[in-house]
Amino acid sequence: MKIILGKNGGFCFGVRSAVETAEKYAGEHTYTYGDIIHNDRVLDELAQKGVRRVDSISEIDDENATVIIRSHGAGRKVYDEIRAKGYKLIDATCPFVKKIHRIVREYRDKGYHVFIIGASEHPEVVGINGWCDRSEERRVGKE
C-alpha cells in the first residue's frame, strides 16, 4: 500500500502558531483558556511542559499567571476578566478568527442583528458570539 500525504497536511498556520506560542510561554505560571487546539497528544505534551488548561479565569489563583487565549478565540468578557485580574494576556487566536470577531463587533456597533450559525457549544462559535454583546444574539446549530 502506498500512502501519499498532501503537501498541505498537518495543522493550519493558526493552530501551528498557537501551539508554538504555548510552547514559548510554557512554565509554572502558564494557563490556556480552554484547549489551545483539538488534539489530545499536543495537549498532553503541553501539560508535561507546565501548561495548564482552565475553563474559567476564576479557576486561576496565581498572581504571576500568564493566560493564553486558545486558537479558537474567546469572547470580549474573557479578555476583560484576564486584564482585570492583572494577568499577562497572550492572544493565540487564529488571525482569521480575529477578523470574524472584528466584523461581528463592527456590525453589532452599527445596529445590525448578528446571527451565528454553527455548532452552538464549539469554542470558536462561543467566542464569536462573545463579541456581539447583545442578549438577543443566539448561537444556532448542532454538531
Task: Specify the residue positions occupied by each region the protein language model found.
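Ser/Thr/Gly-rich flexible loops in soluble cytosolic domains mediating phosphotransfer, phosphorylation
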Residues: 83-112, 116-120
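Conserved phosphate/anionic-ligand binding catalytic regions in large, soluble enzymes, centered on
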Residues: 7-20
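N-terminal beta-loop-helix "entrance" segment that forms/cooperates
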Residues: 34-51
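Phosphate-bearing ligand-interacting subdomains
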Residues: 54, 59, 65-90, 101-103
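Extreme N-terminal starter segment of soluble prokaryotic enzymes
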Residues: 1-4
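Short, well-ordered, mixed-charge alpha-helical segments that flank or form enzyme active sites
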Residues: 76-78, 98-101, 122-127
